[in-house]
Regions:
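Non-catalytic terminal/interface segments that mediate subunit docking, oligomerization
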Residues: 98, 103-106, 305-352, 364-367
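Cofactor-binding active-site loop characterized by glycine-rich and histidine/acidic residues
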Residues: 124
Length: 388
């Protein structure tokens, strides 16, 4: 499947289900809103049209549609990679709407799965007593325009932690121009010298998981784990809790708190059995039913408990509207570079140990068309930048 075309395939499946009377209209009527709007948006994507755009055969796509409609239970496991392109949000929406339209909810093993990280109902509201202050919220994906264009008021100070925006934020060139502002005071608090650290006025060393306490859940596990330090902090490195506690104290907001004290305070708000198991054994499994059936044991957390298949707000915000598709191939730049997670690093961690000459994988047909052979040095570029 060509990168960025997942939304087209999903919409073709929706059209197939509606057109062949395979949509579960009874379920949709009782448990969803906006199904008619979704159907309208999917109408343009026939099996043949979607297959041509996605680079698969019509017979392959139709066979998949038949299998999905026929099998019960049927589950969709949606990961995060599908959203990492300009059509990503619409793709995730279209894919996760399929179980509702096809009527795959209500049975064990049916529906969809993305993450079990909320299985323990573990929320910061359990230990944060003060109300959230009334402050301005800024979309982190708009960092470049925020740093350059916001003036009511403008951003004068940036504190970067747990992220590397120069490498991860959209519109990289604009982000870099913003970070180069002479009047912007930037602090980078990290474990390694990231791309963003090159633009910092001050760099503060952070501890790794080997040096600090933490509470950890995951996308797949039905458990909560406690991470304990196994070595002392190296050099001047400090954990997040202590740095922000010190900042709060200097601002007259709160008393200082160590990493261990914060852990004990947080666990004290938990039910006794969870707290005791966590502190004694280092992990605790979910005390709730870990195998819920969607639309039997659990329902959406929307105000009416229904699936919203067409959000008017998202439709207004999306550049091409909800379920819209943008052709990612341009005349001058017909290929798409995918940058998935690496088996050599964890985000920026260990990045300093990776050899600079990274391998590029290409489809043999694309490589042949460009005269590229194995072990050749290549230049990957578009109108915004390049990597060699």
């Amino acid at each position: 499947v060509k990168p960025g075309t997942d939304v087209v395939l999903a919409l073709a499946l929706h059209r197939y289900l509606f057109a062949n009377n395979l949509a579960d209209t009874k379920f949709l009527s009782a448990n969803s809103r906006g199904a008619d709007r979704l159907q309208t948006r999917a109408e343009q994507w026939t099996i043949d049209q979607a297959a041509k755009v996605a680079g698969v055969t019509s017979s392959q796509l139709e066979k998949f549609a038949e299998l999905y409609a026929d099998r019960n239970p049927a589950v969709i496991r949606c990961g995060w990679g599908v959203e990492r392109n300009r059509n990503g949000g619409n793709a995730a929406m279209a894919i996760l709407a399929l179980p509702a339209v096809a009527g795959k909810f209500g049975v064990r093993g049916g529906g969809y799965s993305m993450s079990n990280s909320a299985a323990l109902k573990f929320s910061p509201s359990m230990w944060l007593q003060a109300k959230e202050p009334s402050t301005r919220l800024i979309n982190m994906n708009h960092l470049g325009r925020v740093l350059l264009d916001y003036n009511d008021p403008g951003i004068e100070m940036l504190f970067v932690y747990n992220c590397n925006p120069v490498a991860t934020m959209p519109d990289q060139n604009r982000v870099i121009r913003g970070l180069r502002r002479e009047d912007l005071f930037t602090v980078v608090f990290d474990q390694v010298a990231t791309d963003t650290a090159a633009f910092a006025d001050i760099i503060l060393p952070a501890t790794t998981f080997l040096e600090s306490y933490d509470l950890v859940n995951s996308y797949g596990e039905m458990s909560l784990q406690m991470s304990r330090p196994v070595i002392d902090s190296v050099g001047d490195a400090r954990p997040n809790v202590e740095v922000f506690s010190e900042l709060a104290s200097r601002l007259g907001l709160d008393e200082t708190e160590t990493d261990a004290e914060a852990l004990l305070r947080v666990t004290s708000t938990m039910p006794d059995d969870i707290r005791d198991n966590l502190l004694e054994h280092g992990s605790v499994s979910s005390s709730i039913n870990a195998r819920p059936v969607q639309f039997v044991d659990v329902k959406p957390r929307t105000p009416d408990g229904k699936i919203n298949l067409f959000s008017e707000q998202l439709d207004a915000e999306a550049p091409r509207g909800l379920y819209g598709y943008q052709d990612l191939s341009e005349n001058n730049f017909p290929l798409t570079l995918i940058s998935p997670a690496s088996n050599s690093t964890i985000c920026s961690i260990l990045g300093e140990l990776v050899e600079r000459a990274a391998p590029l994988e290409m489809h043999p047909d694309d490589a042949k068309a460009r005269g590229i052979q194995k072990d050749d040095a290549v230049r990957v570029f578009n109108g915004l930048g390049e990597v060699q």
